[in-house]
């Protein structure tokens, strides 16, 4: 703020003197006007500025010359004397012309001297501004006060001896000092200049926000100058082209393309016909040619932006959005572009926060792969799933956490579909490194019709969850998968086969431990109670009676064969799995897939119990993973349960059997339970006879169990075994023999069989 009290007093005479010094020679005055002129000229003497003495002297000299010539001009014009001849008039006219020429020369000298002084002083002097009130300091003097040189003090000289050139020089200096610098703009503030230095870093980060296709398109300019000369941005920084394969940096597009060609296979190189651009991808070449033709079919619906591909348009649309999808968990950094977010995390070592969707809702299933090369966030598919989660109760799959190092569990939810009921026997995958407190083992119901009382596990025994392939999770998330071809079998068959394969892997180790704990504590009354319980089943989720083509023939032929004493001590209770819930408590965690041959033992136990007292021969199938189990109580509904808990008979030692039967055996048990029939169609002889499999269509021998060594699955039915083995190719066992597609292990082969129809 200016201090109005300390400012100089207003002096208008100073400006009048400056104005008169500019135009004094051109002002014509009356003969009696010299007094007023003297009074006007004398007034500047009172001014505190001493440099006005030169102006006063110059004005006095000009006025005196004019006063001397005016009477003569007037006299000659009004009273021409006859004695005067034309020669005198011509002489007077010549004198006036010479005087005018002299004045013009003086004016030219004034102008030239002013120009020379202007070129000599490169800076503009801050002086009088017509827009500034008189007497106030000029604002420009505040900025250029340090550059102002002191005004020269005039030397006292007589008015008669002042040369015109000297007067012109002095007046030009005053004119230069009093000329307002109208075209000078003040410099930028330091705050703005510091901000301008930070802006290049931000713009450099935003240059990499484009998609992968747009990065390739950056090298597709058809201007020959742009591809052969380095390109500089608005901040003067040269653009570099870095090779993603070896890290070589080029400064021109031509050099970058020539280097990129060395990494490409000759038969895959695609070159632009108009420039040296090369690529291995057809769509990149297509986008490049579009730029040559100036074709931009993709246009923004909110502005006039057009581009050559959809990726560029998607990246541009983020500029219209107010949602910042990527946020840092350690600072306030937020951006709309994933690549800039990765650069921030790499530079400062920060951790990513919750990723938002385009509408601003948090999406915990997205993970930021900081050092990955793939565009965009990564979907967390292979993360550990908390135990007890069922895919039927939520739309999205259960994920562990937002970041890889964070974990969270979700509560168990009831199953509402047949597939979920069929997969309830599968223990979900758990991380071995997770502590027990972080991932507690929750018991799963055996089926919608049953509930779990308690589960006892021994830490020394391996859990089948560690060996379970990810097919159970796959089936839970994709419940609408296509049916098997040939048979009217749904995914429940696939679930039973996978369960049998997993449990069969545990049989060698678990069999020895469980045989030591077998006890003979069963009676016929419990068998009768179990039979009555089975008859109460309304429907079976594993009812595959319509899916086995030769089921009735096998049953009829096997019933006619004489029953042979079997060397086995395994007892599996027949049990159906209805879809309706029941009030009775279940004694099993998972579904027990029974062996139908034990029904024959039950029927014989009523007549001749001595036949069942035979030596124990272990089954080559998987046993229950539960060890150290308590003895089975008498109450049928209150005992502890496990995935494959065995039942006792009065004369047969108790042992656990695996659910090694496939969907065919479960279909047989479903038929037997629904009809209330105690007969069976096959029995186990204690050995795996995969080589002794009969041809398709022939009745299976009593006690024959067929094993697929490739998939580690046991079959009771020869037809299903033959159909299954027909999918294994001779040259590659995991290549589909029907269509020739290569599969990844037994799980991949089963998924291929489920999803693809073969003719």
UniProtKB/Swiss-Prot annotation:
Region (Disordered): 30-51, 171-215, 366-419, 513-565, 606-696
Composition skew (Acidic residues), residue ranges: 523-532
Residues that bear Phosphothreonine: 179
Family stated for the protein in its record: Belongs to the hunchback C2H2-type zinc-finger protein family.
Record PTM Phosphoserine, positions in chain: 189, 208, 210-211, 537, 540
Keyword hit for Zinc-finger: yes
UniProt biased composition (Polar residues): 39-51
Keyword Lipid biosynthesis part of the UniProt annotation: no
The entry's keywords: Developmental protein, DNA-binding, Gap protein, Metal-binding, Nucleus, Phosphoprotein, Repeat, Zinc, Zinc-finger
Gene Ontology CC: one annotated term: nucleus
Domain of life: Eukaryota
Protein localization: Nucleus
Job of this protein: Gap class segmentation protein that controls development of head structures.
Xref: PANTHER family: PROTEIN HUNCHBACK, ZINC FINGER PROTEIN
Zinc finger intervals, C2H2-type: 241-263, 270-292, 298-320, 326-350, 706-728, 734-758
Pfam families named in the record: zf-C2H2 (PF00096)
Protein name per its UniProtKB record: Protein hunchback
Ranges of compositional bias, category Low complexity: 399-419, 513-522, 655-696
GO biological processes: anterior/posterior axis specification; generation of neurons; negative regulation of transcription by RNA polymerase II; positive regulation of transcription by RNA polymerase II; regulation of neural precursor cell proliferation; regulation of neurogenesis; segmentation
One GO MF term attached to the UniProt entry: DNA-binding transcription factor activity, RNA polymerase II-specific
Biased composition annotated in UniProt, kind: Basic and acidic residues: 199-215
């Amino acid at each position: 703020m200016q201090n109005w009290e300390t400012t100089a007093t207003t002096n208008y005479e100073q400006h009048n003197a400056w104005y008169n010094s500019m135009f004094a020679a051109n002002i014509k005055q009356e003969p009696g006007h010299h007094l007023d002129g003297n009074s006007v000229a004398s007034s500047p003497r009172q001014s505190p500025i001493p440099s006005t003495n030169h102006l006063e002297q110059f004005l006095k000299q000009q006025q005196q010359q004019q006063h001397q010539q005016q009477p003569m001009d007037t006299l000659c014009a009004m009273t021409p004397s006859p004695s005067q001849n034309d020669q005198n008039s011509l002489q007077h006219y010549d004198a006036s012309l010479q005087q005018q020429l002299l004045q013009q020369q003086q004016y030219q000298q004034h102008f030239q001297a002013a120009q020379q002084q202007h070129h000599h002083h490169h800076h503009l002097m801050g002086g009088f501004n017509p827009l500034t009130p008189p007497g106030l300091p000029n604002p420009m003097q505040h900025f250029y006060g340090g550059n102002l040189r002191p005004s020269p003090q005039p030397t006292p000289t007589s008015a008669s001896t002042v040369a015109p050139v000297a007067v012109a020089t002095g007046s030009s200096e005053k004119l230069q000092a009093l000329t307002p610098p109208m075209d000078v703009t003040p410099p930028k503030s330091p705050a703005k200049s510091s901000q301008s230095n930070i802006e290049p870093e931000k713009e450099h980060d935003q240059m990499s926000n484009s998609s992968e296709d747009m990065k390739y398109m950056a090298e597709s300019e058809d201007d020959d100058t742009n591809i052969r000369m380095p390109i500089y941005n608005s901040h003067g920084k040269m653009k570099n082209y870095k090779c993603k394969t070896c890290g070589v940096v080029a400064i021109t597009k031509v050099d970058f393309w020539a280097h990129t060609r060395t990494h490409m296979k000759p038969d895959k190189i695609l070159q632009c016909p108009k420039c040296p651009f090369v690529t291995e991808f057809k769509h990149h070449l297509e986008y490049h040619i579009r730029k040559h033709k100036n074709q931009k079919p993709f246009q923004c619906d909110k502005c006039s932006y057009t581009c050559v591909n959809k990726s560029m348009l998607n990246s541009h649309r983020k500029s219209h959005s107010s949602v910042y999808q990527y946020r840092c968990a350690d600072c306030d950094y937020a951006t709309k572009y994933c690549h800039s977010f990765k650069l921030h995390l790499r530079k400062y070592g920060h951790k990513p926060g919750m990723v938002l969707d385009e509408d601003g809702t948090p999406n915990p299933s997205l993970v930021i792969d900081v050092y990955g090369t793939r565009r965009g966030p990564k979907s967390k598919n292979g993360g550990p799933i908390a135990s007890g989660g069922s895919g039927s109760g939520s739309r999205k799959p259960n994920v562990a956490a937002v970041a890889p190092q964070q974990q969270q569990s979700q509560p168990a939810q009831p199953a509402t579909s047949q597939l979920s009921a069929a997969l309830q026997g599968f223990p979900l995958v758990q991380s071995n490194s997770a502590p027990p407190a972080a991932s507690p083992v929750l018991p799963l119901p055996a089926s919608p019709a049953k509930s779990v009382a308690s589960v006892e596990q021994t830490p020394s025994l391996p859990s089948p969850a560690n060996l379970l392939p990810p097919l159970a999770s796959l089936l839970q998330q994709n419940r609408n998968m296509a049916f098997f071809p040939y048979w009217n079998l749904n995914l429940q068959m696939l679930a039973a086969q996978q369960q049998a394969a997993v449990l069969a892997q545990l049989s060698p180790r678990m069999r020895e431990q469980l045989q030591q704990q077998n006890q003979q504590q069963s009676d016929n009354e419990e068998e009768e109670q179990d039979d009555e319980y089975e008859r109460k089943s309304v429907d079976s989720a594993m009812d595959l009676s319509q899916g086995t083509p030769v089921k009735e023939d096998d049953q009829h032929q096997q019933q006619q064969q004489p029953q042979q004493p079997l060397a086995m001590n395994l007892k599996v209770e027949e049990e159906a799995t209805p879809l309706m819930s029941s009030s009775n408590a279940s004694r099993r965690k998972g579904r027990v897939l029974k062996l139908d041959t034990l029904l024959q033992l039950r029927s014989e136990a009523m007549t001749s119990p001595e036949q069942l007292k035979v030596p124990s021969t272990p089954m080559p199938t998987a046993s229950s993973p539960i060890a150290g189990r308590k003895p089975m109580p008498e109450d049928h509904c209150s005992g502890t349960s496990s995935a494959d808990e065995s039942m006792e008979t009065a004369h047969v030692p108790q042992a656990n059997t695996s659910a090694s039967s496939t969907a065919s055996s479960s279909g047989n048990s479903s038929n037997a339970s629904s009809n209330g029939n105690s007969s069976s169609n096959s029995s186990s002889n204690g050995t795996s006879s995969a080589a002794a499999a009969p041809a398709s269509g022939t009745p299976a021998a009593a006690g024959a169990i067929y094993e697929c060594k490739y998939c580690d699955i046991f079959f009771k039915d020869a037809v299903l075994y033959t159909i299954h083995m027909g999918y294994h190719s001779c040259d590659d066992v995991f290549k589909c023999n029907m269509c020739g597609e290569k599969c990844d292990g037994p799980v991949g082969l089963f998924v291929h069989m489920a999803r693809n129809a073969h003719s």
